[in-house]
């Protein structure tokens, strides 16, 4: 995927006017390399009506380059990942290979909690409180927003996301 901040509702949503917008460079690389399949991932903000023309331009460029295009909003938690992570996925398949593509169907009743998913890892070194943590971490985790050492570590998102992380036994401040 290309950087998400130009389209994120957590940012200024500057789209093409954001210096971090790398869609043009990505499309240039697709033209130069001519891969059989292209997969592009971005935040759901790109589905905003504000970006309709921009999104359509990306899809039309892929079509002009010889790709059939398919776009869908997917959520990782629908496929067994214990995190709320909705992402827009754009698939481009070279038309000389195929014109048909189907996104995977959701995995029913496959939603795992953070505790179920990470239990083995968390208990590997004999952590005595792992059972209590596993019971507490009984939900799907919110999306990590970002962060870096330069900016003080992970950003657990808005206040409600920080609270949700705390309920899972995660302190983003270390």
Predicted regions and their residues:
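Class I S-adenosyl-L-methionine
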Residues: 2-171
């Amino acid at each position: 995927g290309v950087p998400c901040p130009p389209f994120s509702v957590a940012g200024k949503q500057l789209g093409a006017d954001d210096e971090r917008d790398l869609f043009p460079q990505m499309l240039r690389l697709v033209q130069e390399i001519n891969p059989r399949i292209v997969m592009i991932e971005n935040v759901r903000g790109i589905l905003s009506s504000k970006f309709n023309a921009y999104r359509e331009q990306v899809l039309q460029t892929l079509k002009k380059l010889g790709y059939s295009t398919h776009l869908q909003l997917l959520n990782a938690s629908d496929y067994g990942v214990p995190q709320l992570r909705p992402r827009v996925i754009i698939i481009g398949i070279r038309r000389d290979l195929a014109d048909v593509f189907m996104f995977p169907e959701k995995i029913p009743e496959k939603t795992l909690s953070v505790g179920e998913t990470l239990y083995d890892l968390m208990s590997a070194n004999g952590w005595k409180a792992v059972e209590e943590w596993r019971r507490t971490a009984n939900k799907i985790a919110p999306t990590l927003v970002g962060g870096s050492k330069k900016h003080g570590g992970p950003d657990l998102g808005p206040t409600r996301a920080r609270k949700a992380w705390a309920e899972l036994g995660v302190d983003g401040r270390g």
